[in-house]
C-alpha cells in the first residue's frame, strides 16, 4: 500500500513548504483541481524539483470522448504519473482516452472515479438512481474493459472492485483518516486497519497530515504501518 499526500492547502507556498518538509519520504503527491487551476503546470514542475515524488493530478476529467482525450493528452505531457476521469462518462469515452494515451511514449496511470467519497448511500442513489454497490461494480467492469489501470473508490469498495476485475487493478482510496481523525466533508471514511484489510493499493491523506503540527512525523507513522 502506498501513501499519497493531498496538497489541498490554501496557497502554493504552503503546499511547497509541506512538500519540502516531506522530502526523502517514499510517497506520492496529489494535486487537486483548486491547486492546478490556481498554480498551473509550473506548479507540477516545482513539485518535481522539490524531491523524487510521483504526482497524481486529480482533475476528474468528464466531457465528450474527444475532448476528454485531448485534455488527457495535454495533462499527460506535463510529466505527471497518474491522472483520473469519471467512469460515468462512459466506456466509449474511456476507450477513446486510452487509445490516445497508449500512443504516447510514456503515459501516466489512468484511474476512473466510481463514486465520490463525499456521497452517502442515499445521496448517491438520488443522483444516479441506482445503489452504490451496483454502480461501483458496473463502473469498475466498464473501466477495466476500456483498458484503464484502476479506480478511485472508497476503502470499502476496494475488494469488490478487485473481485469483478482482477487483483492487479489499482484501487486508490481517498477519505482515509489514519488514526481516527474527524471525517470533515467525507462520508465514507476509513482508517489504516480497514484500508489494509480491504486491499487498498493507495490511500490519500490530506488534512490529518497538513493540519498536524508535525506533518513529517505523521507521514512516518503512516508509512511504518502500511
Curated annotation (Swiss-Prot):
Pathway: Pyrimidine metabolism; UMP biosynthesis via de novo pathway; UMP from orotate: step 2/2. It comes from the Bacteria. This is Orotidine 5'-phosphate decarboxylase. PROSITE patterns: OMPDECASE. One of its GO terms (biological process) is 'de novo' UMP biosynthetic process. Homodimer. GO terms for cellular component: cytosol. The keyword Lyase applies. Substrate binds at residues 8, 30, 58-67, 117, 177, 186, 206-207. Its EC number is 4.1.1.23. The lineage of its organism: Bacteria, Pseudomonadati, Campylobacterota, Epsilonproteobacteria, Campylobacterales.
Amino acid at each position: 500500500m502506498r501513501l499519497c499526500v493531498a496538497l489541498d492547502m490554501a496557497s502554493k507556498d504552503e503546499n511547497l513548504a509541506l512538500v519540502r518538509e516531506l522530502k526523502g519520504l517514499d510517497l506520492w503527491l496529489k494535486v487537486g483541481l483548486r491547486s492546478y487551476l490556481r498554480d498551473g503546470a509550473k506548479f507540477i514542475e516545482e513539485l518535481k524539483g522539490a524531491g523524487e515524488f510521483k504526482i497524481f493530478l486529480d482533475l476528474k476529467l468528464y466531457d465528450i470522448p474527444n475532448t476528454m482525450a485531448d485534455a488527457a493528452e495535454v495533462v499527460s505531457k506535463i510529466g505527471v504519473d497518474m491522472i483520473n476521469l469519471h467512469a460515468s462518462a462512459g466506456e466509449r469515452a474511456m476507450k477513446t482516452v486510452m487509445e490516445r494515451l497508449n500512443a504516447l511514449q510514456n503515459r501516466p496511470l489512468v484511474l476512473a472515479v466510481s463514486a465520490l467519497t463525499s456521497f452517502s448511500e442515499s445521496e448517491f442513489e438520488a443522483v444516479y438512481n441506482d445503489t452504490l454497490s451496483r454502480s461501483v461494480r458496473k463502473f469498475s467492469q466498464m473501466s477495466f474493459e476500456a483498458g484503464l489501470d484502476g479506480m478511485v473508490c472508497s476503502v470499502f469498495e476496494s475488494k469488490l472492485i478487485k473481485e469483478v476485475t482482477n487483483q492487479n487493478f489499482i484501487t486508490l482510496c481517498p477519505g482515509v483518516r489514519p488514526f481516527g481523525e474527524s471525517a470533515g466533508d467525507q462520508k465514507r471514511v476509513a482508517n489504516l486497519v480497514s484500508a489494509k484489510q480491504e486491499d487498498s493499493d493507495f490511500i490519500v491523506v490530506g488534512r490529518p497530515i497538513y493540519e498536524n503540527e508535525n506533518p513529517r512525523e505523521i507521514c512516518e507513522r503512516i508509512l511504518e504501518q502500511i
